[in-house]
UniProtKB/Swiss-Prot annotation:
PROSITE patterns: SHSP. The keyword tRNA processing does not apply. Residues 84-149 are annotated as: Disordered. Belongs to the small heat shock protein (HSP20) family. Residues 84-101, 122-135 have a biased composition (Low complexity). It comes from the Eukaryota. This is Small heat shock protein hspG7. The gene is hspG7. Residues 30-207 form the sHSP domain. Gene3D superfamilies: 2.60.40.790. Keywords: Stress response.
Length: 207
């Protein structure tokens, strides 16, 4: 019968290997793990409690699953934009021409190519200069906004997070139909009740 000491020993022995695996690049889907959330695991007489700190993350950004006796907690912590940055994105999207429009103008045939005798070339050059001037002004406004933000300390982490917990040694004790999750104040709590009657030995009768 596995005890809480077996679980703790498993966690301690595999801690560094798990960190290497969880913080490395996954070649299958090329996902880089940027954050390794801290975790506490407690076994009581009637339940297993798993607590994981996920500050600054909403519950919609968290995915939890159990596959092949491995509990996985993963998701993405996104950086929130302030009001000034949000306004800049809105203004840029509303004033700047889309890339598809620019591509169609550059790659597709223009009216001037078919009406060289009707439309003077000076008009085309004037339009080009005007467009270049507008683009330059937009870049200058963007640079001014960026230069106004002065970051003195940057210690917060953003990106993909993932944490594994191997339940192989205690899975036979747990009632997976009783899993309960709570997420409050940045703390994810997963509670799994233990079975009333459990055994890691299966008795086989001879017919």
């Amino acid at each position: 019968m596995a005890t809480i000491f077996d679980i703790l020993n498993t966690l301690n022995n595999n801690n560094f290997e798990n960190c290497k695996r969880q913080c490395s690049t996954n070649k299958s889907n090329k996902t880089i793990i940027d954050i390794l959330p801290p975790m506490d695991v407690t076994m009581t007489n009637d339940k297993l409690i798993i607590e994981t700190e996920l500050a600054g993350i909403s519950k919609d950004q968290i995915e939890i699953d159990i596959k092949d006796s491995i509990l996985t907690i993963q998701g993405e912590k996104k950086k929130n934009l302030n009001k000034q940055q949000q306004q800049l994105v809105i203004e840029k999207s509303s004033t700047s021409p889309s890339s598809s429009t620019l591509d169609s103008k550059e790659n597709g045939p223009s009216i001037e190519e078919f009406e060289d005798d009707i439309k003077p070339k000076s008009t085309t050059s004037t339009t080009t200069v005007s467009t270049a001037t507008t683009t330059k002004e937009n870049k200058e406004d963007e640079n001014k906004t960026k230069s106004s933000d002065k970051k003195f300390i940057s210690e917060r982490s953003f990106g993909n997070f993932k944490r594994y917990l191997d339940l192989t040694k205690v899975l036979y004790q747990l009632d997976l139909n009783s899993i309960n999750t709570q997420f409050e104040n940045g703390l994810l709590t997963i509670t799994i009740n233990k079975k009333l009657h459990y055994s890691n030995t299966i008795k086989i009768n001879i017919n």
